């Protein structure tokens, strides 16, 4: 009956007499934080051959993300796999999952920017599983509804000078019928891609290594007149919105 209780004796002396009262104290229930480091909810499958640099990049990215914010303990676990991706220029991918298969992230072991790539793909994961509902990405819902928690962040992204440069070039490519360029422009302007690139840049503010990875992609895409990232001053209001969103969730 008292298997989880501990007997205690209270002794009181009064008027030359001694009174003893027996009572029981229950064990303190173990407490579990509602918010945990993101790395504690990730199952990393490191690569084997020729994967040392990518493995280190993934580990560094998770350590950096842990320094920036937490995630709810109830957030589903995400497998992260360091693999060979047979697509030139592709550093990683996020699979949103189905009823039959859970979500996962793949990071290319030969791309050279694994830390930045992991931050980008983890941004997709959070957009989908933390901020999204019913399988949707929160970034899309935030663009559609002013009441969504990502609404102000998404407005800041599309009002930025970086986004305007992409839109301006996209219109030129429409006029000139540059179809391959148009496809890339549409890709960059998709809400979930805007969110993931911005999330990676926000995280990279805590790590010079990650910032090199993120801005390397920026320099490459600038050559095609579609800059993927934001200049420092242009990004400042966006960073503040990320701070606000995660703070409102109690994750910072």
Model regions: which residues?
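Active-site-flanking segments in enzyme catalytic domains
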Residues: 4-13, 19-252
């Amino acid at each position: 009956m008292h298997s989880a209780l501990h007997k205690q004796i209270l002794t009181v002396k009064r008027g030359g007499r001694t009174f003893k009262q027996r009572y029981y104290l229950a064990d303190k229930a173990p407490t579990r934080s509602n918010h945990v480091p993101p790395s504690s909810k990730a199952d990393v499958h490191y690569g084997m051959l020729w994967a040392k640099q990518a493995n280190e990049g993934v580990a560094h990215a998770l350590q950096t993300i842990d320094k920036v914010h937490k995630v709810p303990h109830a957030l589903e676990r995400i497998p992260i796999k360091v693999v060979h991706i047979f697509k030139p220029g592709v550093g990683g991918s996020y699979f949103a999952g189905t009823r039959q298969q859970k979500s996962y992230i793949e990071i290319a072991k030969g791309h050279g920017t694994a830390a930045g790539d992991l931050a980008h793909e983890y941004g997709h994961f959070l957009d989908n599983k933390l901020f999204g509902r019913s399988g949707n990405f929160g970034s899309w819902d935030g663009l559609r509804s002013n009441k969504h928690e990502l609404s102000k962040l998404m407005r800041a992204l599309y009002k930025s000078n970086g986004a305007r440069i992409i839109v301006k070039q996209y219109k030129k490519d429409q006029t000139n019928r540059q179809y391959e360029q148009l496809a890339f422009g549409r890709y960059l302007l998709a809400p979930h891609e805007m969110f993931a690139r911005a999330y990676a840049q926000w995280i990279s503010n805590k790590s010079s290594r990650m910032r090199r990875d993120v801005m390397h992609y920026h320099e490459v895409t600038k050559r095609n007149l579609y800059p993927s990232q934001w200049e420092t001053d242009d990004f400042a209001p966006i960073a503040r919105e990320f701070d606000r969103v995660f703070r409102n969730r109690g994750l910072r």
